[in-house]
Amino acid sequence: MAIVKEITADLIKKSGEKISAGQSTKSEVGTKTYTAQFPTGRASGNDTTEDFQVTDLYKNGLLFTAYNMSSRDSGSLRSMRSNYSSSSSSILRTARNTISSTVSKLSNGLISNNNSGTISKSPIANILLPRSKSDVDTSSHRFNDVQESLISRGGGTATGVLSNIASTAVFGALESITQGIMADNNEQIYTTARSMYGGAENRTKVFTWDLTPRSTEDLMAIINIYQYFNYFSYGETGKSQYAAEIKGYLDDWYRSTLIEPLSPEDAAKNKTLFEKMTSSLTNVLVVSNPTVWMVKNFGATSKFDGKTEIFGPCQIQSIRFDKTPNGNFNGLAIAPNLPSTFTLEITMREIITLNRASLYAGTF
């Protein structure tokens, strides 16, 4: 016979496990991650219909991920690029079938286990947008013109070309030939100029969208996306910590090298004239922008798209957000003074120059 007990408050307290019996293994994330997507619900748009156009719309786009990076040396930036490419490829490969789970992984940071010393463990922003209306890849390089002649090899003088004895003997004739006689015969000394490869230029790319909100959530997403891009494009101003460290090193060196050896033991060794001269280093105002962006194609790709290429690490160079009303009451009813279509244009510039090893992350 089953024993029936009355459900009381004391019985509820005794049921289950005590809270102190275990704890969550998930650690707290100190960095707040701002997420936005257009259209809203795009990440969870794993549509079950057979319409290819619908599913393809939600499975393709651009993913903009922002990180706080303190180190700006070339080695750290190039390793960040390769680490992002390798770690994100395995995650984005699952986007073909499970879009929602992919974005949940992306919200935890694509490179959370790499370069933990210089890169924030979690991204500060994840923005998912459709493919840009303008998709132009531009690579430019710089060349240095090299001009050499006998005069340049001789130190810039005609006498430097020859030895001392020979230059004394022929200098007068050489000077007269180069200055007048050759010109009288319609001739000019010919100097060959060569162009030598000087390296790549920093790449820039323009992303443009015409965003038409179809719901209130879409409208709020557009506003938030613009505000996130705009906010993280600005830097922070403050007093330079590096300059203050330099002041400390200089003061210590001056005190240990000049003051202490030449001063009596009971003499004051601080507040010297040199310290007053270096006091200006404590008030050096600087601007800093640690936000680094990575841009990658999000979704299903094929061999016709070429090799998977990421754009970054880069920073925002300019933003243009056109919200001019195009008539009365053309927008949503909740915001009649806003346009029916917003134009967002973002220009990004890579902060490192690439080479063959870093262009396709060594996969070419």
Curated annotation (Swiss-Prot):
Protein species of origin = Enterobacteria phage T4 (Bacteriophage T4)
What induces this protein's gene, according to its Swiss-Prot or TrEMBL record?
Expressed in the late phase of the viral replicative cycle.
Keyword Repressor annotated: no
Q: Name one Pfam family in it.
A: T4_tail_cap
**UniProt cross-references to InterPro entries, sorted A to Z:** Gp48_T4-like
Any one cellular component term from GO for this entry? virus tail, baseplate
Protein name (record): Baseplate tail-tube junction protein gp48
Keyword rRNA processing (UniProt)? no
Instruction: Recite the lineage of the species.
Output: Viruses, Duplodnaviria, Heunggongvirae, Uroviricota, Caudoviricetes
GO term, biological process aspect, one: viral tail assembly
What does the function comment of this entry state? Baseplate protein that forms, together with gp54, the baseplate-tail tube junction. The tail tube first 2 annuli are formed by gp48 and gp54, which are in continuation of the spike complex. Involved in the tail assembly. Morphogenesis of the baseplate is completed by association of gp48 and gp54, which bind the upper part of the baseplate dome to form the platform for polymerization of the tail tube.
Subcellular location field: Virion
How is this protein organized at the quaternary level? Homohexamer. The tube first annulus is composed of a gp48 hexameric ring. Interacts with gp54. Part of the baseplate macromolecular complex which consists of gp5, gp5.4, gp27 (central spike complex); gp6, gp25, gp53 (inner baseplate); gp7, gp8 (intermediate baseplate); gp9, gp10, gp11, gp12 (peripheral); gp48 and gp54 (proximal region of the tail tube).
Keywords, sorted A to Z: Late protein, Viral baseplate protein, Viral release from host cell, Viral tail assembly, Viral tail protein, Virion
